[in-house]
Amino acid sequence: VERLAGGERTATAAAVATRARELGLAGPPLLVSAERFPDGLAAGVLAGAVLRAPLLSTRRDELSPPVYPWLASYGTGALTVVGGPVAVSPRVRCQIVTGFQYSFLCP
């Protein structure tokens, strides 16, 4: 058993995503709201079982500090944001646009 943790939920997600990369999950990461768990639950299945991709989380109105450095270090140049603008705001989407190809999975 290996314990993966961070100082708060977005840091924990980044720690798990880092370990996933180390274990060979090489698909483009998915980004979900750290504040709305249903998106994360649904995306977890897609990320792990289908895409073999890491799952990151962020605050709705501000890109969480662990996310951008993770993307800069481990990202594939692509990112999928799961959820609509209520889950991940347009402001956060604008923060991640530079340097990444991205897509949105919205209801």
Language model regions located:
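Extracellular glycan-binding segments that recognize GlcNAc-based cell-wall polysaccharides
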Residues: V1-P107
